[in-house]
Design a protein with these regions (language model features):
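Mg2+/Mn2+-dependent nuclease catalytic core
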Residues: 60-93
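Active-site metal-binding core of divalent-cation-utilizing nuclease and nuclease-like domains
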Residues: 24-53, 132
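Conserved catalytic cores of phosphodiester-cleaving nucleases, focusing on short active-site segments
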Residues: 22, 43-68, 87
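Residues at secondary-structure transition points
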Residues: 5, 9, 13, 38, ...
């Protein structure tokens, strides 16, 4: 129970950090936590006319099994094909409901939080459906 609460807290913090990270990279945040019964999209953003549906995967550095190998750890690899399919389905519905004809894509942001120093390391992987993770 405590671990689940900790995981949710890290996820919530990670999503906020990812949104700020994307804004600094020139993205406009359109929505956050878009939910449907079969899935949720953490961040919906736009950049250069393309709608971006962003899945955020965040972990706390303190929870890593081997902190010395932090640079090798990739939280974005936790996004599997099943999750990508759910994201694609939810994204398509969002575009249909909003009658949005623009191009869209699925992106992933991996976040490693260093809670002791209140810092984070973020990585953006664009076009995740193309196997860019």
């Amino acid at each position: 129970m405590v671990q689940d609460a900790q995981r949710k807290r890290v996820g919530r913090i990670g999503e906020g950090i990812a949104a700020q990270f994307l804004e600094r990279k020139g993205f406009k945040i359109l929505a956050r936590n878009y939910r449907k019964p079969w899935g949720e999209i953490d961040i919906i953003a736009e950049k250069r006319g393309t709608v971006r549906f962003v899945e955020v995967k965040a972990v706390s550095r303190e929870s890593l099994p081997d902190v010395s190998r932090e640079m090798d750890y990739r939280p974005e690899e936790m996004v599997d094909v099943r999750k990508l399919r759910k994201l694609a389905r939810t994204a398509a519905l969002y575009m249909e409901v909003h009658k949005d004809k623009r191009e869209y894509q699925i992106d992933v942001v991996g976040v490693i939080l260093v809670e002791a120093t209140r810092k984070a390391r973020c990585r953006l992987f664009e076009q995740a459906l193309e196997g860019n993770l």
